[in-house]
A protein has these predicted regions:
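Conserved ABC transporter NBD signature motif
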Residues: 67-79
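Conserved signature/switch motifs of ABC ATPase nucleotide-binding domains
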Residues: 135-138, 156
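Helix-to-loop junction immediately C-terminal to a conserved catalytic motif
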Residues: 59
Length: 261
């Protein structure tokens, strides 16, 4: 795929920060990556390799020190409603209910009240929180809070979902369950228009289970070590975790992450 056909295109992006001592710290090496419309791509790599930095560049929260990030062929210059972000920390407004959190984005963009209400009903039901609309974040379990965060994100109808370890804080069983929920929600949200996903995770099995491709990054300054195609058809079933190809991919990625730079 050429950059012209990509939903997201990362072209020679690098990022350097200044440390407290005034030294230049290279967090992200030159990265080139194209992501197709409707594709689900995960990034795995060692801690501090620049995964979240790359996501922040694509979200428009940070500018690259060199190179360029594009969406639909246009440079990304800042945040925008066409790109939704879901964080590990849920990032819900504690003073708003589930319904209030989901309504916040569309309402703040001036969408008509009846349309906002319709979106709230639709997306709250999609993430299976109907009946909890009047609850506040502190009244929800971790899994419910993350589903609310996802509903709030997709209520803005973004083309691209940028997800930074959204399931990392959950217990193992809840995490496995929400992986299936995430795939279901992504599929339902993509019915009218494909949603492109960039997903950051430390969990190799999660990356394989969710993704069309897995990007393996090196130690800091992070560069792409390899891009691995995931061979499993969609919809995904939990049984693929026992497939020998699943285990072979897990081993391949693990060995890449263990390898010295």
């Amino acid at each position: 795929m050429t950059a012209a056909g990509a939903k997201i295109s990362v072209q020679g992006v690098a990022k350097t920060f200044q440390s407290a001592a005034g030294d230049a710290v290279s967090a992200l090496g030159e990265v080139d990556l194209d992501i197709a419309p409707g594709e689900f791509v995960s990034i795995v790599g060692p801690s501090g390799c620049g995964k979240s930095t790359l996501l922040n560049v694509l979200a428009g929260f940070e500018e690259p020190s060199q190179g360029e990030a594009l969406m639909d062929g246009r440079p990304i210059r800042g945040p925008g409603p066409e790109r939704g972000v879901v964080f590990q920390e849920y990032a819900l407004f504690p003073w708003l209910t589930v319904a209030g959190n989901v309504a916040f984005g569309p309402a703040s963009r001036g969408i008509a009240a009846d349309e906002v209400a319709a979106r709230v009903r639709h997306y709250v039901a999609m993430v299976k929180l109907d009946g909890s609309e009047r609850k506040y974040p502190h009244e929800l379990s971790g899994g419910m809070r993350q589903r609310c965060a996802l509903a709030r994100c997709i209520a803005n109808d973004p083309d691209v979902l940028l997800m930074d370890e959204p399931l990392a804080a959950l217990d193992a069983l809840t995490r496995l369950s929400l992986q299936d929920e995430l795939l279901r929600i992504w599929s339902e949200a993509s019915r009218e228009r494909p949603k492109t996903v960039l997903y950051i995770t430390h969990a190799i099995d999660e990356a394989i289970y969710l993704s069309d491709r897995v990007v393996v990054m090196s130690e800091r300054p992070g560069r792409i070590r390899r891009v691995i195609e995931v061979p499993f058809a969609r919809p995904r079933a939990p049984e693929i975790r026992t497939d020998p190809r699943f285990h072979a991919l897990t081993d391949e990625i693990w060995l890449l992450l263990r390898r010295e730079p």
